[in-house]
């Protein structure tokens, strides 16, 4: 097995590679016509992400189109919630809606422990099929939402601009919030282990809303629970690389490095040279390219990729965007991103 590792997995493990691997967050999705056509036939997001045949088909769409070095499970960070007794729906124009927001002790105490093999068997099926069919031509990636971000959704009840409800809980009833975060950390750790057992070779933790916290509050409500998830995973799978992504992470990069993750995925608001100085050498870096550059012309895309890579040539690096690819991105520009990325050499 050691001789036949796919490129992204090799790079994530710190092995010598000839070029940086390339994939994109949200590489399966609305910018692709083939996805939009499928969405017309299956308008429910939950059906698309929870029906194993559909999730598999969507996960593979960018692989067939662009041959990225990573194939990521098509799912959602909220997908494990029903297995804990929290129902949700995703409305196309509004995003996620939690049917019964979690705001009391009795609600938190009544949450179920997540049993992924029972409530998320479809995820296992998809990852197993991806691993078999991708056949090490690319690395299969799994992912989860981090405890703080999941808590933000379930307390607020939906996406939020200022997170006043969860911050009110954090500063008025911190014990209540810690109880919820702890429940999520244990469940998400188990869910990641299930994904790895099912076929994920690298996993990514999305703490999308941790960038809304001050550094001192990150140390209380986000960092420790990210670390708890990583510790649970590493206890059983010490050699599976874990990536951590936070949107708006410039103020907490050093703190992210203390969570036990192997790779930090950067948004585009931080200078990558500066980030290299702030992140220990043994930790890899992913991303940093502004997804907005994909609305430019081909030359500007190539120049930005070259500029980013030249600043980080001496580090373990995975080429990616600093956020998910945006709806409306021209598919040919995504093609340019992948094609040019594969021409880079160490």
From Swiss-Prot:
It catalyses: uroporphyrinogen III + 4 H(+) = coproporphyrinogen III + 4 CO2. It comes from the Bacteria. The record marks 76 as: Transition state stabilizer. Keywords: Cytoplasm, Decarboxylase, Lyase, Porphyrin biosynthesis. GO terms for biological process: protoporphyrinogen IX biosynthetic process. Its EC number is 4.1.1.37. Homodimer. This is Uroporphyrinogen decarboxylase. The gene is hemE.
């Amino acid at each position: 097995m050691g001789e036949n590792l796919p490129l992204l997995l090799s790079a994530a493990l710190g092995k010598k590679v000839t070029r940086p691997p390339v994939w994109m967050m949200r590489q399966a999705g609305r910018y692709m016509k083939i996805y939009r056509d499928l969405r017309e036939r299956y308008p429910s997001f939950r059906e698309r992400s929870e029906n194993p045949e559909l999730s598999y088909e969507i996960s593979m769409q960018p692989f067939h189109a662009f041959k990225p070095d990573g194939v990521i499970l098509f799912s959602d960070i909220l997908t494990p919630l029903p297995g804990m007794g929290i129902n949700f729906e995703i409305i196309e124009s509004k995003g996620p809606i939690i049917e019964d927001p979690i705001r009391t002790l009795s609600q938190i105490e009544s949450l179920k422990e997540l049993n992924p093999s029972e409530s998320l068997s479809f995820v296992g099926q998809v990852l197993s099929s991806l691993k078999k069919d991708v056949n090490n031509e690319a690395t299969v990636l799994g992912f989860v939402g981090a405890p703080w971000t999941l808590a933000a959704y379930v307390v607020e009840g939906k996406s939020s601009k200022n997170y006043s409800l969860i911050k009110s809980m954090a500063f008025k009833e911190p014990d209540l919030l810690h109880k919820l975060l702890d429940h999520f950390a244990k469940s998400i750790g188990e869910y990641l282990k299930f994904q790895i057992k099912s076929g994920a070779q690298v996993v990514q933790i999305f703490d999308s809303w941790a960038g809304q916290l001050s550094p001192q509050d990150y140390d209380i409500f986000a960092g420790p629970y990210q670390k708890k998830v990583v510790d649970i995973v590493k206890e059983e799978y010490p050699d599976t690389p874990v990536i951590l992504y936070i949107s708006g992470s410039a103020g907490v990069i050093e703190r992210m490095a203390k969570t036990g993750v192997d790779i930090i995925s950067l948004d585009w608001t931080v200078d990558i040279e500066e980030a290299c100085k702030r992140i220990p050498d043994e930790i890899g870096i992913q991303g940093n390219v502004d997804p907005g550059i994909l609305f430019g012309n081909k030359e500007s895309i190539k120049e930005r990729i070259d500029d980013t890579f030249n600043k980080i040539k001496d580090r373990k690096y995975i080429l990616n965007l600093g956020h998910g690819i945006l709806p409306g991105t021209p598919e040919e520009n995504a093609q340019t991103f992948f094609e040019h990325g594969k021409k880079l050499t160490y």
